[in-house]
Structure formats: structure tokens, C-alpha cells
């Protein structure tokens, strides 16, 4: 099934703790070239909730429960200088991992203090924060025809994965999401799955990186020739997290 099947968070089981939401906003120059100060007076948080019977609520609040779900974590980045053909990122997650997702962004687009920098509005820095191509203007066409990555290999304890000849960028952008029943992105976002059905919470395969040697477990990427900009390699991974609810308190395992 393609249903995520994620468990609900039992708020009644953490009655001795506070549930807080922390929002961190980008600088204004990240998303606009407006020079006047913009403000957000208020916003709403919309939740999907289930109301249960008092007896069930008492059971959930009074008994020990263990829930396993998947979470997304950000991996340390890697800077790649212009003209560099080969770059390696040591993979250091400390949890069982379902999927790896990575992309490349030109360094000038990463400076949140700058919003200008192009000869047209579409080539300004603020308009290209989510431009993962080698073009200076984002569009679906530029993402398709200008990928910064040529090919990639993943080495696990020195053994290369996947064990196929054609590991070019389109393998990780199109084939892996298709065979894993994931959405195929318009942007140049690359995926490798250790799970058969990564969209589902129920375990269907993973790789426990905590049991591996990080210096022999790397993402080895080959960049396109002729790139004139510096790039930053961003990698995120989806892993399993265990939550224990007991005595009104939640703890992480």
C-alpha cells in the first residue's frame, strides 16, 4: 500500500510534559527583494485530532506504549569548489536509515544576506534559493537540462551500491523513486532507498549506519565538467525513531 500509516501522537500520554512548537524563519532577504520590512501579525496552527472515550484516554495515559515512526534529519553539508569533478561525503547517521536524499545548490544562492545578483528578476539570488541546477535561473526546463551531478556511487564499508553500471544522475532522480513508489521530483533531488516501501512506516528494510565505519561509508559523486560555480551538497535522510510513553513522560530511544 502507498498509505503512510503513521501513528498518531498520543498527547494524553505526556500530561507531565509541555508540547511546544518552535518556528524559525528565514531572513526577509531569503525570499523577497522587498526593501520595506515585512511582518507576520499572526498565523494559525491546524491539527488533525481524534477524540477518544475517557476510558481509552485513561488507558493510554496510564500504560507504557512504544511507537516507531520515521523522521527526517539533516546531514552535515559538503562544499564543492568550482571545477571539482569528484567529491566524497562521509555518511554519519546514527540511526537506521530508510532513504537518502540529496541535492546541490550554487553557493551564491546560499547567502541569506543577499537577494540581488542577477541581470534579470528571475536570476536574482532570492528567486533561486530552490534552484538545484547549474543554470542561474530556476525553471523546470533548466532543472531538466542542467543537472550539476553526472553520476554517483554509495559505498557501504567499502562495498559500492548499487552494483550496476549506469549510476548516472537520472537513475537517482527517476528510477529509484519510481521503483520505490515515491514521487518523482521536478527539481534535481536524488534518492537512494534501503527500504522496499519507504513511504510506509512499517519496516520494510533499512541500513543501520551506527554499525558502520564512516570513513568507508561515503557518497561518492561525480560532478559535470565545466561548472563555474561553487556548490554545496545537502543531504537528508529518513530514519526510524522510537518513542516510549510511560508515566506521563515521553522519551526517545
Model regions: which residues?
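Flexible assembly/topogenesis modules
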Residues: 1-253
